[in-house]
């Protein structure tokens, strides 16, 4: 028997507002524990929540960017549960009347475009954070009340690979809107996954399992891959799948049972009596619509149609707004479009991955990268020298030409000096000279390599090729 995988994702995104969802406390990451709190966050008796207008605007902006319908009438509800980092013993959320519904995004997997539906986007407040250490539980309520949006996909995803592509695209769109930085390491983007299997051809869904502790997109994919395999083996062996919540264990790559899954009835939702229903008229919707910036698909089309970049380059460059903005800044400073694209996808990305840093954590700027690329363009700097200059540029900033001179890496373009290197290479490799005369094209490349090696990569490659051909023709 063959099974079809059915996946739905629930993504929590922390909105980048100055204050919290229902209180005036600052909503900033990294503050001293319990320093960004007030009587509303601490649930003192008699205090009343006040809705953050900016958070509503940004929830609407995100909804529109995800092709959703904005509800004219929506409301807030109480989701009741007890936990130490939830002082009210309920969370203010939206249950049956969310702010956004019926959206979608298009993803690309293996060269094919697929549309993934989005059921809803609703607003809610975050809980605090519990830390367990040395037999004690510590509670930090700085995060309590931080504005969140939860984006719930339709069960349209059919593989862990599609889930990964969906998350990448969703993060990209939200980042471009400016409502969140979507940093998983800081908790501003979190994902829970629901997965079930059903026999091919069956319309009814199988029993779903919820996965938690998915702290990176890679862990989402790995957790789903493991769960897909686990459920298939269980079903093939005649077993059944229970509706449960499981935790992904990063060290083993397996999922571990946490608890039997609750239903919505367990939370005893009811309308929030302290907040009036939300009414959004057409004028308000239009005001928000006017604030939506250029989104990744628009930029990608621009890069392909206007700048002549390949589809792949355009896709990679627009995955994050930070990289896309950097690319546009560099070409505005006069850098060649394709060379800039190659460097950002190649040398820059390799440096970021190797050092586990973000672009903003380096000393790179569109100006200094463009300066280096222009030196490569005009022949002042070879690609080999650029690879030696680049790490210094990324770590300390400055001017690429000055770094090249300080390191003694100035490209050799003097004809007499280059002719000497060429002559030595020809004298030391007579067989390659003979091979060249016999029409073996690889011989030329070998000789160029010998010359570059002898010059420690500093010979001007264009002039080397020119002089080498002249000298070979003389022999």
UniProtKB/Swiss-Prot annotation:
An example molecular function term from Gene Ontology annotations: ATP binding
SMART domains the UniProt entry points to: GatB_Yqey (SM00845)
Enzymatic reactions: L-glutamyl-tRNA(Gln) + L-glutamine + ATP + H2O = L-glutaminyl-tRNA(Gln) + L-glutamate + ADP + phosphate + H(+); L-aspartyl-tRNA(Asn) + L-glutamine + ATP + H2O = L-asparaginyl-tRNA(Asn) + L-glutamate + ADP + phosphate + 2 H(+)
GO BP of this protein: glutaminyl-tRNAGln biosynthesis via transamidation; translation
Keyword tags: ATP-binding, Ligase, Nucleotide-binding, Protein biosynthesis
InterPro entries named in the record: Asn/Gln-tRNA_amidoTrfase_suB/E, Asn/Gln-tRNA_Trfase_suB/E_cat, Asn/Gln_amidotransferase, Asn/Gln_tRNA_amidoTrase-B-like, GatB, GatB_C_1, GatB_Yqey_C_2, Gln-tRNA_amidoTrfase_suB_CS
EC number(s) on file: 6.3.5.-
Keyword Ligase attributed: yes
Record-linked HAMAP family: GatB (MF_00121)
Described purpose of this protein according to its UniProt entry: Allows the formation of correctly charged Asn-tRNA(Asn) or Gln-tRNA(Gln) through the transamidation of misacylated Asp-tRNA(Asn) or Glu-tRNA(Gln) in organisms which lack either or both of asparaginyl-tRNA or glutaminyl-tRNA synthetases. The reaction takes place in the presence of glutamine and ATP through an activated phospho-Asp-tRNA(Asn) or phospho-Glu-tRNA(Gln).
NCBIfam families cross-referenced by the UniProt entry: gatB, PRK05477.1-1, PRK05477.1-2, PRK05477.1-4
Entry similarity comment: Belongs to the GatB/GatE family. GatB subfamily.
Subunit relationships: Heterotrimer of A, B and C subunits.
Name of the protein this chain belongs to: Aspartyl/glutamyl-tRNA(Asn/Gln) amidotransferase subunit B
Species classification: Bacteria, Bacillati, Bacillota, Bacilli, Bacillales
Gene this protein is translated from: gatB
